[in-house]
A protein has these predicted regions:
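Bacterial N-terminal signal peptides
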Residues: 2-14
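Periplasmic c-type cytochrome electron-transfer domains
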Residues: 17-172
Length: 172
């Protein structure tokens, strides 16, 4: 589901750019820092957590509980496409906002506001949370209503007061 969406969004962004001016889109063939490329063209995260046994599945709580299993195995091209889409304003309803409009890299991927500003200057109900370590989470949004990153992604994308897009508009 996620890869289909990524591919569709990538094609939409690419076709929109191609309609404006001929351009060559190339995706990275190397992994980001902290990742290692496997023989199967997958980026694997390497961290200090790899050196310790996890207590996550052993029912042990408190400060000694390790992080949950991480999501690994994306190719360098998939990671780079995700990065390009994150900064692409074509995903918003009026093509003026990207994910990075509210999740500023220099602000810890948050916006530093009590309430975020969305499409047409509309005010969101809350501020954008930081995106640090999101790959380790098992629920998303302030009320934990989304159980995956894929499910979470549709929230701000389709919210009328955030990015204000629709599935039909994305495909048009």
């Amino acid at each position: 589901n996620y890869l289909i969406w990524l591919a569709t969004a990538g094609l939409l962004a690419t076709s929109a750019q191609a309609a404006q001016a001929p351009a060559t889109v190339s995706l990275a063939s190397t992994c980001p820092p902290g990742f290692e490329l496997s023989a199967g063209n997958q980026c694997k995260l390497h961290s200090l957590y790899d050196q310790y046994n996890s207590l996550y599945s052993q029912g042990v709580g408190g400060l000694k509980t390790a992080l949950p299993a991480r999501r690994d195995g994306f190719s360098p091209q998939q990671i780079d496409l995700g990065r390009q889409l994150f900064f692409d304003p074509l995903l918003s309803g009026d093509q003026t906002l990207s994910c990075a409009s509210c999740h500023h890299p220099k602000l810890g991927f948050a916006d530093g506001q009590a309430k975020s500003t969305g499409i047409h200057g509309r005010t969101a109900s809350r501020g954008a949370p930081s995106l640090w370590n999101m790959a380790f989470l098992t629920s998303f949004f302030w009320d934990a209503r989304a159980k995956s990153l894929e499910e979470q992604m549709t929230g701000p994308l389709y919210a009328a007061n955030e990015m204000g897009n629709t599935p039909a508009q994305l495909l048009s």
